[in-house]
């Protein structure tokens, strides 16, 4: 995933992310949750959490696993980290304390939370950090790791910031199934399977959905999602837009 924080004058936060997952894992497309009406996002129908979501107060959260590190099968689904933050009333510091107490029961994770002003990074494999304004990218590895797909995502988002059609540019970036092993972007990194492409195609594992989230300087949020088949063909798409409460923070 890649996101721009405090870079665009029109959009204090721009996020573009792909969800790569086993095709057999059941999930639902993004919607306002019936059992928690303030949460908007897709849903993991196996464990009940989500990989990416926002709430009506302007919070955002998203999580990744560590693809090259084995999970403890007895752990709680990482998707609950996202839904728990979006459902809570506490601030980021309170949530950090909660994670510190419970992080051992989760498999390896990167968790990003946005409270409407500040982007926080949490992990049970790396140090907590407050992310500064700028363009960032992260994948299924520790923050700060350099991989072809991470560099491609960051560079692609930087170019999209000046595009005439921002949303179109972001979805085009997320649909990029090319590899970059023969370019300088890969010469600086260690080559690993699937780490050189943004959009993963495969019969068992691949990109299940692409999501673009925009927080505007006018207090509006747009949440757009496209879902895909195992062949990488478009399965469906949805778009949501809502206005934040006036007392919500609107800029990093």
Description of each model-found segment:
Residues 1-252:
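N-terminal nucleophile
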